[in-house]
């Protein structure tokens, strides 16, 4: 997977330089998923939190080396837990143009292949919403999630309605 990511990004960087294109992004936040006492997916020889951190740091280095006018920020650069609301605060505080969250899947397959990419956009909005709800369940693992998120419970059925309303309002305003 990592090899594929490097090839894909290298091709994109070369194309961007050849075309002399102007980057649409001035500030990018790279979020290494999980961390600290939240390992994410656990394999026989690795933990998601370690893989996401390594990939995030390499991606940031590639962007910095090839796109000199783009500022790269990270939600974490060491193995520590950063609560979900703080990750979004980092991006909002600097007015980031792009937020990239790196995650890995687990598989019982002995020779897994492939990758998944999710991008919030106007197509497949329902699928994007389901992914967001799944990722937001990590909120329940935080020590003070009731205080940090004003009592928000990602499992409460009424939140499906609220998520849909917010998503529709965001899409209409985009």
What are these model-predicted stretches?
Residues 12-16:
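Sec/Tat signal peptide C-region and signal peptidase I cleavage site
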Residues 2-11:
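Bacterial N-terminal signal peptides
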Residues 159-168:
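Short glycine/proline- and acidic residue-enriched helix-loop micro-motifs
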Residues 155-156:
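Polar helix-capping/helix-linker motif
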Residues 17-152, 167, 171-172:
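Catalytic-core regions of hydrolytic enzymes
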